[in-house]
Amino acid sequence: MLNTLTRLLDDAGITLPEHQKAQLVAYVDMLNKWNKAYNLTSVRDPNEMLVRHIMDSIVVEPHLKGTRFIDVGTGPGLPGIPLAIVRPDSHFTLLDSLGKRVRFLRQVQHELKLDNITPVQSRVEAFPAEPPFDGVISRAFASLSDMVNWCHHLPGEEGRFYALKGQRPDDEISALPSGFAVEEIVRLSVPRLDGERHLVILKANRT
């Protein structure tokens, strides 16, 4: 699996140190093992996980600004854990409302010795942002409107919302509530992944 990951990274033009590659593979191993009992992802093939979960997450990293992030509705740690592995100088709070997912995240934290993640079991509306975050990240979590309505209290003054989407979500963008604007839409390239991927970066219009 390490060779497959290395080829995918080469195809994407991404260079990672060997220990980070080993951590990413170990995470996929754990996800595959726990998935049999906990049903954490619909993806069953570890090599497919490398494409649809690992590469699909880490291609976002160059576009993140800041060092304190929260991954809302993280599920089994996506995109938060792959991002934490490749961005060790940043901290990621991984938020999910389901206990089985958070238990898995804590086991990943323990086995991979990730000291830059904090798994939390909470609903996003009830989670305090003290201090506020530089970025609020979501992947397959909610519509853009729901994301900013539920998470509006989380980013700091210069903080941003980072929504990982498939096709460009023009309908969701046009339905954004007043007070929020699109700062950038990035078309992402993920090797061996069918379909489009976009990163929508939003910012609150603070007066």
From Swiss-Prot:
Its EC number is 2.1.1.170. InterPro entries: rRNA_ssu_MeTfrase_G, SAM-dependent_MTases_sf. It comes from the Bacteria. SUPFAM superfamilies: S-adenosyl-L-methionine-dependent methyltransferases (SSF53335). S-adenosyl-L-methionine binds at G73, L78, V124, E125, R139. Keywords: Cytoplasm, Methyltransferase, rRNA processing, S-adenosyl-L-methionine, Transferase. It is an enzyme of class 2 (transferase). GO terms for molecular function: rRNA (guanine-N7-)-methyltransferase activity. It holds the Pfam family GidB. It is found in: Cytoplasm. It catalyses: guanosine(527) in 16S rRNA + S-adenosyl-L-methionine = N(7)-methylguanosine(527) in 16S rRNA + S-adenosyl-L-homocysteine. GO terms for cellular component: cytosol. Specifically methylates the N7 position of guanine in position 527 of 16S rRNA. Belongs to the methyltransferase superfamily. RNA methyltransferase RsmG family. PANTHER family: S-ADENOSYL-L-METHIONINE-DEPENDENT METHYLTRANSFERASES SUPERFAMILY PROTEIN (PTHR31760:SF0). This is Ribosomal RNA small subunit methyltransferase G. It comes from Cronobacter sakazakii (strain ATCC BAA-894). The lineage of its organism: Bacteria, Pseudomonadati, Pseudomonadota, Gammaproteobacteria, Enterobacterales. The gene is rsmG.
